[in-house]
């Protein structure tokens, strides 16, 4: 989860372990890489990483919950050098990162990540828009950790996104707690 405000204190009340990464791809990648290294040093294995987070979507209604196991970058643009939008040049990591689904009972969606609070339709094909998912997925891909995400749609990625995001945080936090409990049961 990027921000403590997204959990509305519900994770702390229930002693649910959570890593708050901070906003954006760099913060997310750095904090998760450190946490995975520490976990591997202490336990000898990597945990399954689940990203609970809020998203905008021009396709899905506010209040929707979607599971993501495919992730793309919506702001990687090296088209001027002939590369496809969303592709990081000169590396072997595919532009779409895909993992085994962790939440097959939920609607599935593609998460488009970028370091900008989106208020319009993204230029890459994705169902939901966030600021950390692809970075977390890439760290897990490179480290060999299982990864998935549960995303709560707070807004339509439009001109009202900021207000709608804040208004829907309590609903999002309750949904995250519910899906965390289901993950433990399943």
Map each language-model feature to its residues.
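Glycine-rich phosphate- or other oxyanion-binding loops that anchor nucleotides, phosphorylated ligands
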Residues: 7-186
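Gly/serine-rich nucleotide phosphate-binding loop at the start of the catalytic core
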Residues: 3-5
């Amino acid at each position: 989860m990027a921000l403590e405000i997204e959990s509305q204190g519900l994770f702390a009340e229930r002693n649910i372990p959570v890593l708050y990464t901070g906003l954006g791809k760099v913060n997310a990648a750095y904090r998760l890489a450190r946490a995975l290294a520490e976990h591997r040093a202490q336990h000898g294995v990597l945990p399954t990483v689940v990203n609970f987070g809020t998203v905008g979507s021009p396709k899905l209604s506010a209040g929707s919950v979607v599971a993501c196991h495919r992730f793309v970058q919506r702001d990687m643009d090296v088209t001027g050098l002939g590369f496809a939008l969303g592709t990081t040049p000169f590396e072997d990591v595919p532009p779409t990162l895909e993992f085994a689904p962790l939440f097959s009972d939920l609607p599935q969606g593609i998460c488009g990540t970028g370091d900008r609070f989106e208020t319009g339709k993204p230029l890459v094909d994705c169902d939901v828009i966030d600021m950390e998912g692809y970075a977390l997925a890439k760290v897990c891909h490179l480290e060999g950790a299982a990864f998935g995400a549960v995303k709560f749609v707070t807004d339509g990625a439009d001109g009202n996104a900021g207000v709608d995001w804040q208004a829907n945080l309590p609903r999002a936090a309750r949904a995250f707690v519910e899906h965390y409990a289901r993950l433990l049961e399943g």
